[in-house]
């Protein structure tokens, strides 16, 4: 299936409880396989895998979207509203974009584009000032993808945690 065909056939919709297991496995597979290739020093603990698989908790506080292709969950993203528990947005009235991933078999086929389009449209519907996100330090390809969409580096939102350093990016929706 061509990239254009995959994107054309993708249905972007709100995740449902019956999607939770598929989303959780997709996140674990996508993050581990991609980081294992691009950043071999990254190690995912069992605790991190459990957190990625806990989609029900995310749906309770955030809008979780999926890209469905031929009845299969092929991609996902979560958008946390301002002030939501677990939000990592560092500025007021900003939504927090997290967990953008596509199934490994769909990598490089453009599925992130419609997922991000839908997420950014939802943020505008919420009337937030910006969409905030974090990228693992050193993940230049992912950072470049966001910058090509208009996200700008925002060092004031960087997070340095015991197990990871994250660089902040911001898409301003209002001037």
PLM segments and residue spans:
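Short acidic N-proximal helix/loop "leader" segments that mark the beginning
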Residues: 1-6
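Acetyl-CoA-dependent GNAT
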Residues: 10, 14-20, 24-104, 116-118, ...
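C-terminal "cap" of GNAT-fold acetyltransferases
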Residues: 16, 29, 93-95, 129-149, ...
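A generic structural signal for short
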Residues: 43, 107-108, 130-131
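Solvent-exposed, flexible loop/coil residues
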Residues: 47-48, 110, 163
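Conserved glycine-rich acetyl-CoA-binding loop
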Residues: 99-117, 124-126, 137-144, 148-149
